[in-house]
Design a protein with these regions (language model features):
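Preference for solvent-exposed, low-hydrophobicity sequence contexts
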Residues: 132-173
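Contiguous beta-strand segments within globular domains
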Residues: 28-42
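Short proline/glycine-enriched turn/loop motifs at strand-loop junctions of beta-rich domains
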Residues: 42-48
C-alpha cells in the first residue's frame, strides 16, 4: 500500500483538516527509543476526534483538539507496520472521505541514509517532547520536515500535546 505522510484536505468540514505525519520525506520511520510519533493537525472549522491505527498494534481514538502537534508515545514496533491517521467522521458527513495520512513504521532502518533521516526526526521529536504543553513556531518546524507548502494553512504558533496511546480507547482492529 502506498504511503503519503499528508492526509485530509477535502472540502467537507470534517475531512477538511490537513493531517501530516512528522516523518522523513520517504514516509518510512523507525521510532527507536523512546518510541514517539507525531501528527501535525491543521486548522478545522469543527475539529473532530483523531483516529490512529498502527498495523496490528491497534486503533486508538484521541479527543478533538485545535490545530497543533500531537506527540504520541507508542507500543514497541516489532515488524514493519502501516500507520494511518484520520479524523473520525460519520459517513453522513462525508460519504467519500479524504485519504488518511499514511506512513510506514519500522523496527529499525536498514539503509544508512534512512538511519540518518530517522535520527534527525527523533531529535526533532525529542525537542518537541521537552515543550509538551507549550507551543512552537510553525515555520521552522515545517522547514525541518520539508513541509513549507503548508505554512499559509496553519497558525503561526502550534500547540504541542503529548499523550500515550495505551490507556486511550483501545480497539482491536
Amino acid at each position: 500500500m502506498p504511503a503519503n505522510r499528508e492526509g485530509g484536505g477535502s472540502r467537507d468540514a470534517c475531512q477538511a483538516r490537513r493531517l501530516v505525519h512528522l516523518v522523513p520525506i520517504s514516509d518510512r520511520f523507525a521510532p527507536g527509543e523512546p518510541r514517539r510519533i507525531a501528527v501535525l493537525e491543521g486548522s478545522a472549522p469543527r475539529p473532530a476526534p483523531l483516529q490512529v491505527r498502527i498495523g496490528s498494534l491497534g486503533v486508538w481514538t484521541l479527543p478533538a483538539e485545535p490545530a497543533g502537534i500531537r506527540l504520541i508515545s507508542i507500543p514497541p514496533v516489532a515488524a514493519e507496520m502501516l500507520w494511518e491517521s484520520s479524523p473520525v467522521c460519520t459517513s453522513a458527513q462525508d460519504p467519500i472521505g479524504a485519504p488518511p495520512a499514511r506512513s510506514w513504521l519500522l523496527p529499525r532502518s536498514a539503509v544508512k541514509a534512512d538511519q540518518e533521516a530517522d535520527q534527525l526526526v527523533r531529535l526533532q521529536l525529542q525537542e518537541l517532547s521537552r515543550r509538551c504543553g507549550s507551543s512552537v513556531e510553525a515555520a521552522p518546524l515545517l522547514r525541518a520536515f520539508a513541509l513549507e507548502h503548508l505554512t499559509t494553512m496553519l497558525p503561526a504558533q502550534l500547540s504541542i500535546r503529548c499523550e500515550p496511546l495505551a490507556p486511550l480507547s483501545f480497539k482491536v482492529p
